[in-house]
């Protein structure tokens, strides 16, 4: 599973809820389709695919996204996410803490539902080039994504699906089905937003604890 380079611009809408999010550790009721999208975000961190996020995997993922946490910050973040105290984070812990903000209720409206789907009916998707797709996505999501973000998402998804025909491709030059293309790009964007929010929550949690310890 590739890493998605995204910027802090994706995070701002949810940051004011972080203190409440960190203090509430209760079961969440998330639709199955949204749960699968959150599972994709979890896999970005779970590099060895064993179903757990270790401190080392967390550090690797964050550094790949441009963040440079030190060992103390990583330890604080893991402690925040690790509810059963086993030193690692499983998917249930991941969903319980972060699920409410990673479901559609916590993602900008343009990333899901009718608003998003409408974007893909403005033109002939069968004839859309990669550059045209980039421009279309930027015009629609410029409040949340830079052109560089969009290019990184498309490039990363193309690389991740090379030689994997059963997976949903983002290669818009060769993809022959409009619905597949639409679903795949939407999935990539939601995953990118989710990962950005996860990183923001983790860093804010670590900084809050570190500041408290300095007082």
Curated annotation (Swiss-Prot):
Keyword field: Calcium, Cell membrane, Cytoplasm, Golgi apparatus, Membrane, Metal-binding, Repeat, Transmembrane, Transmembrane helix
Extracellular topological domain: 210-215
Record carries keyword ATP-binding: no
Taxonomic superkingdom: Eukaryota
Oligomer status and interactors: Interacts with PI4KB. This binding competes with FREQ/NCS1 binding in a calcium-dependent manner.
Name of the protein in question: Calcium-binding protein 7
Binding-site residues, Ca(2+) 2: 82, 84, 86, 88, 93
Transmembrane segments: 189-209
GO cellular component, one term: plasma membrane
Organism: Homo sapiens (Human)
Domain EF-hand: 33-68, 69-104
Stored CDD domains: EFh
Record carries keyword rRNA-binding: no
SMART domains documented for this protein: EFh (SM00054)
Pfam families linked: EF-hand_7
